[in-house]
From Swiss-Prot:
One Pfam short name: ACTMAP-like_C
GO-annotated molecular function: cysteine-type aminopeptidase activity; initiator methionyl aminopeptidase activity
Domain notes: The N-terminal proline-rich disordered region contributes to the interaction with PFN2.
Entry protein name: Actin maturation protease
EC numbers on record: 3.4.11.-
Biased composition (Low complexity): 36-50
Disordered, as annotated region: 1-70
InterPro entries membership: ACTMAP
Modified residues (Phosphoserine): 316
Length: 351
């Protein structure tokens, strides 16, 4: 099967970049103010007649109550994000969010199959501007460099210094792999030729073992995959998969008490890997994904993701005329994103 992108099996090590469109330069964002250096402040006048009393001790910090604050990069600069943050309810924990999602979509699942859920817990992070790829990498980094990965600001800084991005955008899967290896210290395997064929089994086995997958795709209005020829190119991270199987292996799985027919691997217990659904079996594989415009997991049909990823060929006309600079590899979106994805594993992992 041929794809419309026909990417090379191995990406070039150092592809030159072509800025699109023309612009002189992008001003660097202002540096945050440095903390006050109290030792540099002038000492108050001293007198034998009026001794200065010692300062009162600071009150103890308030006790932490409720869930930890959500990660929102750019909240201090964006009024829109502030308003959305204030109106939003608490973010559910990973497993609670997945359970909510499965209950919401239970009518989509084939009744002739049993379902096994493999899902690593990912944090959420809301992007600011065209940072979807770096935000997806940050989320993946929490599984690769525990306990909390690396700061998003560092990913942005290194990507900018290496010439991978001008303002947070990432139009090259190969560059994303180089960035992940350098900053997260992980292994990065670039898949080309689409998510079907032999790559399909690689992806599913990767997700079953709990490792993250970075996927470029075209984003619809509800953040789901669509087909816009790359005009809505976006990034997501998947760290979970829902498999429809004829029979659940007897070793290491337990049925969900609230959703009959759904099984989970038992933590801390060896489990027999399930047989992967055959390619071409409709509605048998779903990816659990997150992306930088929502707090929540999303459930996507694997074939829908594969088709969206395989048609990323053109640079968005609206971006080409917005007066900003974007770093695009030689060969454009077709060469940088089409039919490609990134498998990430910890450095010490033999998988």
């Amino acid at each position: 099967m041929t794809s419309p992108c026909s990417p090379p099996l191995k990406p070039p090590i150092s592809p030159p970049k072509t800025p699109v469109p023309q612009a002189s330069s992008i001003p660097s964002p202002p540096l945050p103010p440095s903390p006050l250096d109290f030792s540099a402040l002038p000492s108050p006048p001293w007198s034998q007649q009026t001794p200065v009393p010692p300062p009162l001790p600071l009150p103890p910090p308030p006790a932490a109550t409720g869930p930890a604050p959500r990660h929102v990069f750019g909240l201090e600069k964006s009024q829109l994000l502030k308003e959305a943050f204030d109106k939003a309810g608490p973010v559910p924990k990973g497993r609670e969010d997945v359970k909510r999602l499965l209950k919401l979509h239970k009518d989509r699942f084939r009744g002739d199959l049993r379902w096994i859920l493999f899902c690593a817990d990912l944090p959420s992070l809301i992007q600011e501007g065209p940072q979807c790829g770096l935000v997806a990498l940050w989320m993946a980094g929490t599984l690769l460099s525990p306990p909390s990965g690396v700061p998003l600001e560092r990913l942005i800084r290194v990507a900018t210094e290496r010439g991978y991005t001008a303002q947070g955008e990432m139009f090259s899967v190969a560059d994303m792999g180089r960035l992940a290896q350098e900053v997260l210290g992980c292994q990065a395997k670039l898949l080309s030729g689409g998510l079907g064929g032999p790559n399909r089994d690689l992806v599913l086995q990767h997700l079953v073992t709990g490792h993250p997958l970075l996927i470029p795709y075209d984003e619809d209005f509800n953040h789901e995959p669509c087909q816009r020829k790359g005009h809505k190119a976006h990034w997501a991270v998947s760290a979970g998969v829902l498999l429809g199987v004829r029979a659940v292996p007897s070793l290491g799985y337990t049925e969900d008490p609230e959703l009959p027919g759904l099984f989970h691997p038992v933590l801390g217990t060896p489990c027999q890997p399930p047989s992967l659904p055959e390619e071409g079996s409709p509605g048998a594989v779903y990816l659990l994904s997150k992306q930088g415009k929502s707090w929540h997991y999303q459930l996507w049909d694997y074939d829908q993701v594969r088709e969206s990823n395989l048609q990323l060929t053109d640079f968005s006309p609206s971006r080409a005329t917005d007066g900003r600079v974007y770093v695009v590899p030689v060969g454009g979106v077709r060469a940088g994103l089409c039919g490609q994805a990134l498998l990430l594993t910890p450095q010490d992992c033999s998988h």
